[in-house]
Amino acid sequence: MSLTLENLSYGVDGVDYVRNANLTFQAGSFNVLLGRTLSGKTSMMRLMAGLDKPNEGRLIFNGQDVTGLSVQARNVSMIYQQFINYPGITVYENIASPLRLAKMAESEIDRRVKETAAMLQISPLLKRYPLALSGGQQQRTAMARALVKDATLVLFDEPLVNLDYKLREELRAELRDLFRERQCIAVYATTEANEALALGGTTTLLHEGGVIQNGPVMDVYRAPVNTLAAQLFSEPPMNMIRGRVTDTEVAFDEYSHHALTQELSKLTPGDYWFGVRPSHIALAPANDDDLEMSMEVALSEISGSETFIHIDNSHFEMVMQLMGVHQYHTGAPVKVYLPINKLFVFDSAEKLVHTPSRKSGGAV
């Protein structure tokens, strides 16, 4: 069983929401659509569900063209970021509602509702009403209603965004495990790179309605095809700094030079973009060949147990991500260290030409 998007495009009033998308989703797979707000994630899922019709292209399900099929004729479920439950009926009846619409036998309804409730750990809540539930319990109820009908295609439109961090982690792990056992196609939209990594499976990077890259999550993360993909799949976005490679060294500015390592010596002389993840910039060298840079603090932000420090000099700006709480005043000078063995390299056209080698300890 598979769903293929073939040259799919969709737009309204001259605004393109999906541009020439070509993707295939397989049964038993968990697929993540990762992109910023307005990148086309929701529009793409609405096309898959049959809620909107494409301007161009086709949707192929199991070899059959289903582009014009109504949403009612498709076996699809969609879960939104809002907790959409019917407040006037119990959790049991909320979950049972799509089965009653399908005129299923009462005994089968009861079996499916109780089985799905147990799977999502809400069995004790079946007699309660949605407004008496916590946010996490309400979202579990909405998920149960979507899953109880055994849809062949299950779409998640940022379903955990309104939950607190701990609940999100918990439900994320449950979803990942749940779909390992189900022979349906799951598609999950998110704006967060860390969520895509946690969910695993296949990741599709979207930008302004277009597919930038698609593949197994760690392949996309470790080998982004260009600078845009690298920045989309990094939280905060990967830092990009301009550098020039000569026969003997790489220079980032008049003060920051580094002798070519064995790996970087394979680059032909010229101008490149060098990418470094914010979490890989350090306040002390981890290796003898780490590149030292003199910077100035532009902004320091503490978020939970992490500190994000925006730093710059006359040539470039970067963000560094540090574990723990660190206090830095705006304008304070700071020396930072970039691990040469963890640099991504992109050519002047911003295409990937070098990834950090796992053999050299640069796996990212």
Segments predicted by a language model, with ranges:
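Conserved structural motif at the start of ABC-family nucleotide-binding domains
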Residues: 3, 18-20
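The feature captures the beta-strand-to-loop junction immediately N-terminal to the Walker
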Residues: 34-36
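Helix-to-loop junction immediately C-terminal to a conserved catalytic motif
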Residues: 49
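Conserved coupling/switch loops of ABC nucleotide-binding domains, chiefly the family-specific signature
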Residues: 53-58, 208
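ABC ATPase nucleotide-binding domains
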Residues: 74-77, 81, 85-226
